[in-house]
Curated annotation (Swiss-Prot):
Gene3D superfamilies: 1.25.40.90. The gene is ent1. Coiled coil: none annotated. It comes from Schizosaccharomyces pombe (strain 972 / ATCC 24843). Belongs to the epsin family. This is Epsin-1. Binds to membranes enriched in phosphatidylinositol 3,5-bisphosphate (PtdIns(3,5)P2) and phosphatidylinositol 4,5-bisphosphate (PtdIns(4,5)P2). Required for endocytosis and localization of actin.
Amino acid sequence: MKAAVRSVKNFSKGYTDTQIKVRNATTNDSWGPSGTAMAEIAELTYDQNEMLEVMDIIDRRLNDKGKNWRHVFKSLSLLEYCLHNGSENVVRWAKDNIYIITTLREFVYVDDNGHDQGQNVRTKAKEITSLLEDEHALKEARGDSRERDRDRDRTRSSRFDDDDDDRAPYEESRLSRAPSRASRYDDDDRDHRSRRRSRSRRPGRSRSRRRSRRPSPSAEHNSAEENDPELQRVIEESKRQAEEDAKRRNMANDSEAELQKAIQLSKEEDEARQRHQREREQQEQAFMGNQQNAYQPVDFFGNPVQPQPTGFLQQQPTGFIRPQNTGFVQPQYTGFVQPQHTGFVQPQATGFMQPQRTGFVQPQATGFVQPQATGFVQPQATGFMQPQRTGFVQPQATGFMQPQRTGFVQPQATGFMQPQRTGFVQPQATGFIQPQRTGFVQPQQNGFFNPQPTGYMQPQRTGMMQPQRTGFSQPFESNNPFPVMQPQRTGFGQTPNAPMMAPNHTGYVHPQPTGLQRQTTGYTGNNNPYSRPLQSQSTGILQQQQQQSAPRLEPTKTGSNNPFAQFSNLPSQSTAPATKPMKPVRTGDDRFSNIAQAISTGNPMGTDSFGNIGLTRVPTQHTGSKFTNSAGQTIQAQATGNTHNPFQSQQATGYYKQPMQQQQNMQQPYYNQQNYNYQNQQPMQGMQQQSMQPQVGSLIDL
């Protein structure tokens, strides 16, 4: 039944005779393949086409399922036989597909009875793997198989020859006796020979030719190589690989040539770019050289002038920038003007005020900054340097701000002088005004200060301070450089009509009717040019009074020469005691009569015990009074009546606290007949003076 099914399947699948023989040798029957069938298949392997058909069926059987373990085992047995007796192509195929055989060493199958049927398969796979891995054992096995085949063929041929010799006489007698029987034996022998001949002829070669080829191994190897498709495929693959390598080398050579060509082109481009850059630089240098030659500054004799090392950016008429001569823009190619061609003023030729020639107060020359020249810088001794107590040491060198323009500082609200009104602080000698160095602002035609060799401003023609704009007055014959500020009732709507003073009167304003209303001023006779307290003021709309005239020069009890007393702490009090004239102090020593006379008269130019005059006299921290020659009572600071004054603060350090009294107007005219003859009139807006309580003291007594 199985044979019939197999025959139908062979026919339906279209298997060839060689494939059918291999399938019959590897059936699933319980018996193994016969030796004759395996020998015939081994003979077929010498033909290349039939060898491929044999190996194809063996490969399928080796990869069959586990239940068909007999297919696998019989295929391994047939392969082992072909390795011993087949062609060399079988050996090469087995080595190329050794992984299939190696995998079968792990073959496992257990049947329904619990028997491991894969044991035989694993054993056979291990034997074939060992044979393929051992080349020497494989050669010996194949050699032994050839010897056995030769012996078998020799034995068979000799047997056939002996049979023929023994049969000849018998055949002759027999043929003579029974011709029919002899012809029958001949027919049988011919059939037998024809079968053998056909069997040997099917592989495509005769046994005789195989025998003649076997003794020569080299010839057999050569013929096997010629008929081996794998070898041919390998050879073809090698040729193809060689061709690919040659092409790759050619491509590499081509790419190398292209790379060299690209490198050469890059070099040429780089050289061309550098050449163009050099040409452009040469052209620029030539153009710049022409420009430089065209605009090269020269002196009076035609020699080229080098640019001055100034902090200004140099400029030439060219708009090209040369970055190599400056850290920023090159001078000869910048768009900036060089110092010799620029409109900028050179520092040595500028019209601006030089520091050594300016009319401003030099810090090193002033008596207020240097403590060793004056004693007024110490804050504990004077309140002079404090902002709330000054009001008169303002930038005296200005004079740009005109009093008529500032209407925001009310006289009753502040006791400070406007900065444009000052100009009386002499820096080089004392903190007070030196008559021979006027220090007043000259009324020039322009609004600038001309630097004079003296360093002070000349008061000839100033157009800054207009006299008709001030509401303050000064007697014509008064030599007081600081005019008294008259308290007044301000009557708005009044038209000022004050003429301008002559240049020899230092630009100060004569008492003229102004739009501001004034009250009668009482003078205290104080010699201090700064301490001029104001009387209480009252404002009235559209009222006018005549100004009070010239003060008297007489010593009083309040004859203190301290210029800082009126700037001490101001409480809000309104009582003012009447001032009394002060009698001269008698020291009983005629040796110091001049000092006593100077102290008693309140002369600020009197000398002290050390020979100092004016502001250089010893201040109050070294004596009992404000100055060593300031005899009499000191002036008590009075309240201004305005508690919102931002400059009112505590009393300056170095002074003892004194009780505050009523605010009063003080005026101290001063006139020196021996050395100076000048008249000063200075309008002061909002200056409120304060008086201190009298304190009797004398340098001689101390």
